[in-house]
């Protein structure tokens, strides 16, 4: 299993440290691991009885793509038969305030979503997952434009575009410009459910997967431009 996130267990950590400050006798080292980034992944593996590889990736909002890429690598190497890629975020006042530094118009959100990736001949297929494009040597707009060219998705009326736009023009500019000529169906889930940070791309991916699985579209593009690291996307489809 691979768990991807931005914030981590903020509410649990706040509760833990609040109790410790109120009563230092509660400061047991046995409890401390519950507050670290890898705690959710470890708990889920224990819940499902998995002794397989388990990892947590901390990234910007595009981390779910990195999780899928690592899962595909594990499967190709024969380390695992299948991999559950999960992302979850919970919101508190501190993370909501942090979003406000980017824009006062952000709508903070939370949630969780997961995709199970395996080598099989049935189900929705991961057709393309190009390497992400870093912001280290180019702007966010340039990175997103280059990424679209690498994906080379066909605007044929049978392909859905599920983008990462949130309804704030300045934040949305990279994807707005990179996909300005897209004439097919286009969904922007964050405009409806808000900014769930690490979980947003996972929610986009599930929306895209369900649209293909239900036969609404033959293929779907999922794309996102991260806050400070990279732009990433993928193409999935039934054929």
Regions picked out by a protein language model, each given a short descriptive name:
Residues 70:
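Internal active-site segments that recognize and position negatively charged phosphoryl groups
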């Amino acid at each position: 299993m691979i768990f991807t996130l931005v914030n981590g267990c903020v509410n649990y950590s706040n509760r833990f440290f609040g109790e410790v400050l109120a009563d230092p006798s509660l400061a047991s080292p046995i409890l401390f691991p519950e507050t670290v980034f890898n705690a959710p992944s470890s708990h889920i593996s224990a819940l499902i009885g998995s002794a397989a590889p388990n990892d947590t990736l901390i990234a910007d909002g595009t981390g779910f793509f990195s999780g899928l890429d690592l899962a595909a690598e594990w499967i190709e190497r024969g380390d695992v038969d299948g991999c559950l890629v999960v992302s979850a975020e919970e919101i508190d006042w501190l993370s909501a305030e942090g979003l406000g530094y980017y824009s006062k118009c952000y709508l903070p959100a939370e949630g969780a979503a997961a995709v199970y990736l395996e080598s099989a001949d049935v189900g929705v297929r991961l057709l393309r997952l190009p390497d992400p494009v870093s912001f280290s040597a180019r702007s966010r707009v340039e990175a997103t434009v280059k990424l679209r060219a690498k994906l080379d998705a066909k605007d044929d009326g049978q392909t859905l575009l599920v983008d990462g736009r949130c309804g704030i023009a300045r934040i949305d500019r990279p994807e707005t410009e990179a996909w300005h000529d897209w004439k097919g169906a286009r969904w922007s889930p964050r405009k409806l459910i808000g900014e769930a940070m690490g979980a947003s791309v996972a929610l986009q991916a599930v929306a895209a997967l369900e649209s293909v699985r239900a036969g609404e579209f033959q293929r779907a593009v999922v794309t996102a431009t991260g806050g400070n690291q990279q732009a990433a996307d993928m193409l999935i489809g039934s054929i």
